[in-house]
Amino acid sequence: MTREDFYRKVAEVLEVESVTDGTRFRELEGWCSLQAFGLLVLLENELGVRMDIETFQTVETVGELYGQD
């Protein structure tokens, strides 16, 4: 999956127009645990990355999420 495709899917999960490397997803209006779960599922289903909650809590940006593959 390309970075652009991943970012498009992340934007869908976060219910925003678009995201970039530097988007701090936890700072977005409406951020909630349901979106956190959606990002974890997206990582596993699309990138094959299973991230534990402790690691997820240290990730701050969308670029860092993509770098987990």
Protein language model features and the residues they cover:
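Phosphopantetheine-dependent thiolation modules in NRPS/PKS and related acyl-activating systems
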Residues: 1-31, 40, 46-69
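Two-component histidine kinase catalytic core, primarily the HATPase_c
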Residues: 35
